[in-house]
């Protein structure tokens, strides 16, 4: 089953529509566990993908100083220490993982070849559509 968002994956589990799901964002499962749902995350022994959420200042931004201030705020102790309470891994190694989740250093991460993905993007999209439509 293909759905349109990470949250929809978690919802199919909490409603009992599915017993298992493959998902790229543990945050929603973590929040559901916090609410008492019996959802378990399995970290594959052969590796999991880490999907970053970058904060950047775009070249030519109309207010670069404000953008830099926001970027600095996003990596500050104040913000980074809020993330685990929402089931999100912080981007800094000095911040504990979400409660009950292993530290990132204990999760085998799969390397992602972004250049190859970019080269193969059209073929990958075509193949995806062939399989799932």
Task: Tell me what each language-model feature is.
Residues 1-44:
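Ligand-binding pocket segment of bilobal, Venus flytrap-like solute-binding proteins
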Residues 2-7, 60-67, 117-121:
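Solvent-exposed, acidic/flexible segments
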Residues 33, 37-49, 58-60, 99:
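Short beta-strand->loop
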Residues 50, 63-64, 76-77:
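Binding-cleft/active-site segments that stabilize strongly anionic ligands or cofactors
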Residues 52-63, 82-83:
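A bilobed periplasmic-binding-protein/Venus flytrap-type ligand-binding module shared by bacterial periplasmic
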Residues 73-97:
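Periplasmic-binding protein-like
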Residues 99-133:
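Extracellular/periplasmic bilobal clamshell ligand-binding domains
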């Amino acid at each position: 089953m293909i759905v349109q968002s990470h949250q929809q994956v978690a919802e199919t589990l909490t409603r009992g529509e599915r017993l298992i799901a493959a998902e790229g964002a543990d945050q929603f499962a973590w929040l559901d566990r916090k609410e008492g749902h019996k959802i378990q995350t399995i970290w594959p022994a052969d590796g999991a993908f880490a999907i970053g959420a970058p904060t950047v200042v775009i070249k030519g931004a109309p207010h670069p100083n404000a953008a830099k201030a926001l970027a600095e705020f996003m990596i500050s102790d104040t913000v980074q220490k809020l993330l685990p309470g929402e089931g999100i891994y912080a981007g800094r190694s000095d911040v504990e993982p979400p409660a009950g989740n292993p530290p990132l250093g204990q999760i085998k991460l799969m390397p992602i070849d972004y250049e190859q993905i970019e080269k193969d993007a059209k073929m990958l999209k075509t193949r995806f559509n062939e399989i799932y439509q």
